[in-house]
Regions:
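Hydrophobic membrane-insertion alpha-helices, especially the h-region
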Residues: 1-13
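Soluble "head" domains of membrane/secretory-pathway proteins
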Residues: 13-19, 27-192
Length: 192
């Protein structure tokens, strides 16, 4: 009985398991993949740029996407933390965070631009800016700037950081956050 309680406790309080319904995170995570998250983020472990986060749909993002699954959870890469200014000139230009252009080739789907459209967002306290790795097929923060939440995810809606793929068996392995991509980006203090 004790082993069952331990497993149940771990599942409820430490780890989450999620099925991936869309191609918004290709080629990092494919449709049908299943991932494990740690529920220890954002507390007590701090979120970092590059983390692959699972979060509650902040402003009904899935409503206009013709979603066929019945989950209100999304998975994207964390790009902007509170205080960050995230911008892009569009048309293949790199994403720029706090004045530093970042090279996302380590995780962007091959052949996909960082963003076709231009944008500039300063992330307020308590919010996050997220993007899919397959930007051509991702309704992420860029696509929801007029949703009432300005396309930003409340930190409290984050359910965990994905760190491992457990299905399909031929793709079992660790997921990389590619924190090194963001190493030169300075930290900014958020405003309310």
């Amino acid at each position: 009985m004790l082993p069952v309680l331990i497993v149940l406790g771990l599942r409820l309080f430490v780890f989450g398991m999620y099925a991936i319904p869309s191609g918004s995170m290709e080629n990092t995570i494919m449709p049908g993949d299943r991932v494990i998250t740690t529920r220890l983020s954002p507390r007590p472990i701090a979120l970092r740029r590059g983390d692959i986060i699972v979060f509650k749909d902040p402003a009904n993002w899935l409503a206009n996407e013709g979603a066929t699954h019945n989950s209100d959870r999304l998975i994207k890469r964390l790009i902007g933390l509170p205080g960050d200014t995230v911008e892009c000139a569009g048309n293949g230009a790199p994403i720029v965070i706090n004045g530093v252009p970042i090279d996302e080739s380590a995780y962007l789907k091959p052949g996909v631009e960082p963003s076709r459209s231009a944008f500039s967002v300063t992330v307020p306290a308590g919010r996050l800016f997220v993007l899919g790795d397959n930007r051509a097929n991702s309704a992420d923060s860029r696509a929801h700037t007029n949703d009432g939440a300005q396309g930003l995810v409340p930190v409290g809606d984050v359910e965990g950081v994905a760190f491992m793929r457990y299905w399909p068996l031929n793709r079992v392995g660790w997921l990389s956050a590619h924190h090194d991509v963001f190493r030169d980006v300075p930290t900014r203090t958020p405003t309310s």
